[in-house]
């Protein structure tokens, strides 16, 4: 009980620091990515360390997007259903979570094949954000697409071709990230307005002892995607909050906010040769009726800290020679 009280006090102190307006000092300049491609709902950015390109998705546009910083151009790959996220695989293909299942996509000939479908997947949900752990397991969650308010979604783990339901009672599964040493997993179910930190068993891929690490203050927007930096600090995109934010997951303290000229900020990823460039995805969200000419575009900045190399999916089934 004492530990809980102390943790709550530290977390509250972190929120006071955020609300005191001390987090926008020396904010880096934010600019648009080269070709200015627009996504209805840009999401799931991840830097492919093999090809030195950024992979991301346009959910409503049914597209996987590949942005090359060298040329400033973006290649478009259409997929048959709404993609929630994409991650590169060790075999050179991409793992793409579509509405109705998890697929492997081959860039060379633009072919797609189904890898796994959870037994409990229904038409009332679709796959959303996801990432791989340091051992190459793919973690991905679903979202309630009927009211975006009911806890009917779940979080899954894909190992090889075997998919396992890990958490239930989820509403809008979003950001997932691991501490640099892989012993903690950070997870966001957006309506809860918090980041939960789980002790993580790297050998088995099991979660235990989840604790509230970060609470997003009212009026800041809702927590969406997240990523970790080389110092172990967690970055959280603020949907409806015009910003991305950097937090200390041990204290709950907000360290920095980077403002953007669009309301619906969805996710961010570190990339570039030195992993010192941040790529930030946004949503056009036409239904919102906002006058934002740059909404849905990809933004870039140099936040002053480096990221970590992305974990690739391991397609080999456990126990397979």
Roles of regions detected by a PLM:
Residues 5-17:
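Bacterial N-terminal signal peptides
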Residues 23-39, 68-69, 210-211, 304:
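A short helix->beta-strand "capping" segment at the edge of beta-propeller domains
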Residues 36-51, 80-97, 121-137, 166-184, ...:
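Beta-rich, blade/repeat-based domains predominating
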Residues 47-49, 54-59, 95-100, 138-146, ...:
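Conserved beta-strand positions in repeat-built beta-propeller and related beta-rich domains
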Residues 63-65, 101-103, 153-156, 194-196, ...:
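A short loop-to-beta-strand structural motif that recurs across blades of beta-propeller domains
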Residues 109-146, 162:
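Asp-box/WD-like beta-propeller blade repeats and closely related beta-sheet repeat scaffolds
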Residues 198-205, 303-308:
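Short loop/turn segments immediately following beta-strands, especially the blade-tip
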Residues 271-321:
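Blade-level signature of beta-propeller repeat domains, shared across WD40, Kelch, NHL, RCC1
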